[in-house]
């Protein structure tokens, strides 16, 4: 089940985002330590969508979608270990469908740092296509790396 998360869901969203197998993959050198991270301000912003994924009442993952403009949203994917695989692909497509049905969104994009092969593979499995490279745009472990830009449109 996909649902829009609110401030009342902050504990679960924080738990997913700061999970030891998730946070290192979604954070860069400018982010706070996982224990200091608080998603509450993002959940309080009506322009940002946080879509939670639950299986039989158990939180499995979530997507944070931030607007670039009226119709384009950048997705940040956070799937807990044990829930990755075919079900996560279905859930990602459901989350994207939710955005297309319930918001002005007509395009979802994501940025994947060079070297994050699992994230790149997942994005392509859910139908995203490579659209370009943003050179030297991500700082991780003291190294500056490129990011791959991928996207999918409502019509696709």
Show where each model-derived region lies.
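A conserved beta-strand-loop-helix scaffold within acyl/acetyltransferase catalytic domains
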Residues: 63-71
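A short beta-loop-alpha structural element at the N-terminal edge
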Residues: 1-18
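Conserved catalytic-core motifs of GNAT/GCN5-like acyltransferases
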Residues: 111, 129-145
């Amino acid at each position: 089940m996909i649902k829009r998360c609110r401030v009342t869901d902050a504990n679960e969203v924080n738990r997913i985002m700061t999970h030891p197998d998730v946070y290192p993959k979604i954070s860069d050198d400018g982010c706070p330590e996982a224990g200091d991270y608080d998603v509450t301000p993002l959940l309080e912003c009506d322009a940002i969508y946080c879509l939670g994924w639950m299986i039989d009442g158990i939180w499995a993952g979530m997507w944070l979608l931030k607007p670039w403009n009226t119709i384009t949203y950048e997705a940040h994917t956070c799937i807990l270990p044990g829930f990755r695989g075919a079900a996560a692909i279905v859930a990602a497509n459901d989350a994207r469908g939710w955005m297309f049905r319930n918001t002005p969104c007509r395009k979802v994009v994501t940025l994947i740092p060079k070297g994050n092969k699992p994230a790149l593979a997942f994005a392509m499995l859910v139908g995203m296509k490579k659209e370009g490279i943003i050179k030297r745009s991500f700082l991780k472990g003291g190294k500056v790396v490129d990011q791959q830009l991928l996207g999918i449109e409502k019509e696709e």
